[in-house]
C-alpha cells in the first residue's frame, strides 16, 4: 500500500483522483498537546500516551484540568504501567487520590504510592519534599481525625529529610510554611530570613517574613521594613500583582504611625486595581486620612463607603465622628438621624448625638441622648453621663 485513493465528486471526476500517501498515516502520533486536539476528542477513541516520558508528563498536566478525577486516575494508571520507574507517576496519583480519600483504606493507597515513589526515585529529596507538601496541605484542611501519624510535625520531618539531601531554598520556604502553620513563628522566621537571602527571594517571601514578625509582636518598624522590601520588588506604575502588598504595607505604615505614607499606599492600590474597590477600602483609607488630619478626604471616603453599603451603620457613625471632629455638628446630627431611621435601637448613634449636642452647648438634649444610649446598652456612655449629667 502506498496510498489510499478516494473517488472525486463533481465536475472533475473524469480527470482527477485524490489520494493520501501512506507515509502520512505513519507520521501520525500523540503529542503532549493531543489531549486538547478537538479532532481527536470528537473521535471518542481513548488516546495513547505520547512516546516519551517527558511528553507524557506534559500530557498528564494538560489532562488534569480537563477530566474528572476518576478519568485522570485512569490516565495515571496508564502512565505508571508505561513508566513504572518514574517517581512522578506515583506522586501525581497520590496527590489525586488524597483529594478523593474518604477513609483510612484510601489513605493507605496514598501512602503506598509515596513509598513506591521514594523507592524508584533518582532524586529522593524531591519525593520527601512532595510528601511534606502532601501532609502539610492535608493538615491545612483541618481533618477531624488526622490519618494515623500525619501531623505538622511529620511534615516538618519529611521536609528536613529533603533539606538533608539538598538544601534548596524552595525546601527551606516549605519548612517555614509548615512551621508557621504549627505556630512556631520564631523557627518559621529563621527559615524565611534564609530564603530572603537566596535567589528565590520575592515579594511573597518577604511578605511571609513580615506577617511572621507581626504575629511575634515585633516592633512595627521591623514589620514595615520587611514590607518595604516586599513592595520594592515591583515597579511603578503598579499592577494588580502588587496591589495586595500595597494594601498590607498601608496597614503596616498605620501601625508605625505613618498615616500620610499609608494614604499614599492606599492611593497607589486604588490606581493598581483601576478603582475597583469596595466599601471596606474606603473605610480603611478614611482611617488613614483621619489620622493624618486630612479631614476633607476622610469625609469624602466615608460618604463613598456609605454609598456602596448604605445599611452599614458603622460607616454612618464614623462619618458622624469626622463631622464632630471638624465642628460640623449639625451635619453629624443629620447623619446620625439617618442611621436611626435604619435602626432605631442603634445605641452608638445616641451617644454620638449627645457628644455633638454638647459641642453645640445643648447640655439638656445631650444628657437625654446619653440616657437613651445607656437604655439601649451602650457600654461607653457611663463616663459621659458621670462627667456632664450629674
List each language-model region with its residue ranges.
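Residue-level recognition of tetratricopeptide repeat
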Residues: 86, 124, 168-169, 202, ...
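Structural marker of alpha-solenoid helical repeat scaffolds
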Residues: 82, 120, 164-165, 198, ...
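Canonical tetratricopeptide repeat
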Residues: 92, 130, 174, 208, ...
Amino acid at each position: 500500500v502506498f496510498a489510499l485513493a478516494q473517488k472525486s465528486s463533481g465536475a472533475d471526476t473524469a480527470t482527477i483522483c485524490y489520494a493520501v500517501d501512506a507515509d502520512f498515516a505513519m507520521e501520525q502520533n500523540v503529542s503532549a498537546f493531543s489531549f486538547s486536539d478537538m479532532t481527536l476528542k470528537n473521535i471518542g477513541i481513548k488516546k495513547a500516551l505520547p512516546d516519551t516520558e517527558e511528553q507524557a508528563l506534559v500530557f498528564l498536566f494538560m489532562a488534569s484540568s480537563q477530566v474528572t478525577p476518576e478519568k485522570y486516575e485512569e490516565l495515571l494508571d496508564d502512565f505508571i504501567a508505561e513508566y513504572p520507574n518514574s517517581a512522578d507517576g506515583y506522586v501525581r496519583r497520590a496527590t489525586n487520590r488524597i483529594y478523593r480519600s474518604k477513609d483510612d483504606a484510601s489513605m493507605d493507597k496514598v501512602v503506598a504510592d509515596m513509598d513506591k515513589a521514594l523507592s524508584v526515585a533518582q532524586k529522593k529529596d524531591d519525593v520527601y519534599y512532595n510528601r511534606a507538601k502532601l501532609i502539610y496541605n492535608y493538615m491545612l484542611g483541618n481533618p477531624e481525625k488526622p490519618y494515623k501519624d500525619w501531623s505538622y510535625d511529620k511534615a516538618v520531618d519529611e521536609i528536613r529529610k529533603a533539606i538533608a539531601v539538598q538544601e534548596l531554598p524552595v525546601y527551606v520556604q516549605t519548612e517555614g510554611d509548615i512551621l508557621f502553620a504549627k505556630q512556631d513563628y520564631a523557627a518559621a522566621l529563621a527559615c524565611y530570613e534564609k530564603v530572603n537571602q537566596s535567589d528565590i527571594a520575592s515579594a511573597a517571601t518577604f511578605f511571609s517574613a513580615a506577617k511572621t514578625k507581626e504575629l511575634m509582636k515585633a516592633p512595627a518598624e521591623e514589620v514595615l521594613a520587611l514590607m518595604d522590601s516586599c513592595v520594592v520588588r515591583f515597579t511603578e506604575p503598579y499592577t494588580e500583582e502588587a496591589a495586595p502588598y500595597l494594601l498590607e504595607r498601608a496597614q503596616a505604615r498605620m501601625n508605625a504611625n505613618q498615616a500620610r505614607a499609608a494614604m499614599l499606599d492606599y492611593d497607589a492600590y486604588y490606581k493598581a486595581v483601576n478603582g475597583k474597590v469596595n466599601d471596606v477600602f474606603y473605610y480603611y483609607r478614611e482611617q488613614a486620612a483621619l489620622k493624618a488630619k486630612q479631614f476633607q478626604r476622610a469625609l469624602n471616603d466615608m460618604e463613598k463607603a456609605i454609598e456602596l453599603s448604605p445599611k452599614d451603620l458603622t460607616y454612618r457613625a464614623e462619618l458622624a465622628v469626622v463631622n464632630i471632629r471638624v465642628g460640623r455638628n449639625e451635619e453629624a446630627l443629620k447623619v446620625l438621624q439617618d442611621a436611626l431611621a435604619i435602626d432605631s435601637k442603634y445605641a452608638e448613634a445616641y451617644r454620638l448625638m449627645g457628644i455633638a449636642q454638647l459641642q453645640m452647648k445643648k447640655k439638656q438634649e445631650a444628657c437625654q441622648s446619653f440616657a437613651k444610649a445607656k437604655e439601649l446598652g451602650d457600654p461607653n456612655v457611663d463616663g459621659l453621663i458621670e462627667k456632664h449629667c450629674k
